[in-house]
Amino acid sequence: LFAADCANIYLEAIMSIRPVKKLIKSKPTMEGAGVHLRRAFGFGNTSDYDPFLLLDDFRNDVPEDYLAGFPWHPHRGIETITYVLAGTVEHGDSMGNRGAIAAGDVQWMTAGSGIIHQEMPKGDPTGRMHGFQLWANLPSALKMTPPRYQEVKSEEVPQITDDDGTHVRLVCGSFWGKKGPVEGIAADPVYIDVSVAPGQRKSLPVETTRHAFAYVFAGSGKFCNASGPLAVPTEGVGWLETVPPSEADNRSLILFDSGDEVTVQAGDDGIRFLLVSGKPLQEPVAWYGPIVMNTQEQLRQAFTELEKGT
């Protein structure tokens, strides 16, 4: 065995591998003024993903499917994390901020007490647009915090390459001794973009106290020692097929159970995925559209204030 393989086996022997709890295929939907995208999770069982609420994969080569964008709309009580891989997202808000999120960039917006903004995607020279938007819930004590942005350019995102060639872009949190550029986030999340070479097996630490999920957007692989068909609940992965999937491929979301590490065995084409974890808030969720509060009364109050312009 190579030294890296021996090290991985040793680490797995002393750590607890997180089993796969659920495998989900992201589902096509439309948002904004008619943007075609895929939703990995959202508007469902929030407790499994707490403190996260929603993950959208906006990936398209047809400009007509995304150029209408996301015109002016409100948010309150959440944080939105936009990570762009191709193309650009131009944005503006009710506080007078204007800017653009280009390939490799990250924008972390804390909506807090309320903000109205717009996000308008523009493709790269080939017409391609690709990115992700993740929503993170704010704890009750910070629901009405003043809105703010953290904008990170691609060159500011730490990149780590392990001895076996595994490559990580560190969007947020601490990982492998490095610290990401986004700070002061209530859920203390770790958000990484991971690339593993073909056939390579890799173990990645995740704190036991966190909820964690992965989202595959290139290649395929087996997570957490899955040796056969995944005997876990699946959604959107071929209801008419008699044999459940044995690995996670493009546009698959993997929700993990408890443990302190995630393992992946990359397929023949390698694998690239987001790995996201955060500390659960364990608070009530009252959610309607772009506004997330703790009670129905708070939700009604938010929409009343929005209608009055206050």
Task: Go through each PLM region and give its residues.
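Jelly-roll (double-stranded beta-helix
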Residues: 2-310
